[in-house]
């Protein structure tokens, strides 16, 4: 019964956000500031799922300039966990098929997110060039999931190199965002589903990396994130066991 209640409320809330959000965005379409606004609105669903989301970020995070944010991509619950920490003006890079999701697809495009055709390598590389051009024209940051797909309980997957090519080409730092494990954690028929920690790490300077060191940079970032996620998972387990959620 709790599952059905949560599902109904989530669907109604999401449709309302997408419909009225799309109308709102028509007055300033493709404005990158909208992404954080509506990302935070979806983040408000966390308590409905019985989750306490704790966000941590450096004290000067709101003053960061252009950057590429990279985050671990676990499942659909990323929409109510990682979305809470998105900083304006940040847009995401998502697959083109997202456009076909009723209501959400239209909002996703209107808020200024970038779409990539993963089935066409030429167009995919073109998107990286587009990202670099965006950095040159205005103050904007890009949010990417370097794993390229949801991990679904398989741990941190190998990183694809697109985000790191773009960072080196544009000369902007990479900012890792780590989310504690949510796979196999959430039971929608259970009232309380515990703690999730979302932590933004300090920027990683890419100026010391050349175009031929993309994989080295990717491996370095993945190592940092893997270690931090393990630390967060340990903290979550200890706090939940002690009832200090």
Curated annotation (Swiss-Prot):
GO cellular component, one term: plasma membrane
Keywords of the record: Acyltransferase, Cell inner membrane, Cell membrane, Formylation, Lipid biosynthesis, Lipid metabolism, Membrane, Phospholipid biosynthesis, Phospholipid metabolism, Transferase
Pathway: Phospholipid metabolism; CDP-diacylglycerol biosynthesis; CDP-diacylglycerol from sn-glycerol 3-phosphate: step 2/3
Modified residues (N-formylmethionine): 1
GO BP annotations listed: CDP-diacylglycerol biosynthetic process; phosphatidic acid biosynthetic process
Reactions performed catalytically: a 1-acyl-sn-glycero-3-phosphate + an acyl-CoA = a 1,2-diacyl-sn-glycero-3-phosphate + CoA; a fatty acyl-[ACP] + a 1-acyl-sn-glycero-3-phosphate = a 1,2-diacyl-sn-glycero-3-phosphate + holo-[ACP]
UniProt EC number: 2.3.1.51, 2.3.1.n4
Entry-linked Pfam families: Acyltransferase
Alphabetized InterPro entries for the sequence: AGP_acyltrans, Plipid/glycerol_acylTrfase
Subcellular location: Cell inner membrane
Membrane topology reported for the UniProt record: Peripheral membrane protein
UniProt short sequence motif HXXXXD motif, positions renumbered to this chain: 73-78
One MF annotation (Gene Ontology) recorded for this entry: 1-acylglycerol-3-phosphate O-acyltransferase activity
Family (UniProt): Belongs to the 1-acyl-sn-glycerol-3-phosphate acyltransferase family.
Role played: Converts lysophosphatidic acid (LPA) into phosphatidic acid by incorporating an acyl moiety at the 2 position. This enzyme can utilize either acyl-CoA or acyl-ACP as the fatty acyl donor.
Domain observations: The HXXXXD motif is essential for acyltransferase activity and may constitute the binding site for the phosphate moiety of the glycerol-3-phosphate.
NCBIfam families hit by this protein: AGP_acyltrn, PRK15018.1
Name under which the protein is recorded: 1-acyl-sn-glycerol-3-phosphate acyltransferase
Organism annotation: Escherichia coli (strain K12)
């Amino acid at each position: 019964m709790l599952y059905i209640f949560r599902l109904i409320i989530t669907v109604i809330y999401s449709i309302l956000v997408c419909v009225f959000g799309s109308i709102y965005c028509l007055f300033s379409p493709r404005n990158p500031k909208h992404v954080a606004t509506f990302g935070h609105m979806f983040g408000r669903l966390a308590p409905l799922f019985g989750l306490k989301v704790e966000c941590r970020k450096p004290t000067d995070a709101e003053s960061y300039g252009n950057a590429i944010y990279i985050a671990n991509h676990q499942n659909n619950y990323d929409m109510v966990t990682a979305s809470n920490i998105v900083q304006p003006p940040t847009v995401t890079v998502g697959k083109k098929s997202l456009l076909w999701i009723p209501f959400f697809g239209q909002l996703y495009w209107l808020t200024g997110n970038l779409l990539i055709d993963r089935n066409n390598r030429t167009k995919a590389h073109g998107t990286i060039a587009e990202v670099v051009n965006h950095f040159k024209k205005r103050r904007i940051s890009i949010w990417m999931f370097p794993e390229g797909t949801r991990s679904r309980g398989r741990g941190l997957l190998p990183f694809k190199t697109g985000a790191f090519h773009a960072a080196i080409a544009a000369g902007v730092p990479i900012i890792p965002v780590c989310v504690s494990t949510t796979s196999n954690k959430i039971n929608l028929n259970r009232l309380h589903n515990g703690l999730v920690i979302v932590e933004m790490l300090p920027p990683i300077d890419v100026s010391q990396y050349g175009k031929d060191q993309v994989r080295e940079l990717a491996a370095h970032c993945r190592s940092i994130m893997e270690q931090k996620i393990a630390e967060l998972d340990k903290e979550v387990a200890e706090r939940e066991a002690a009832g200090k959620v």
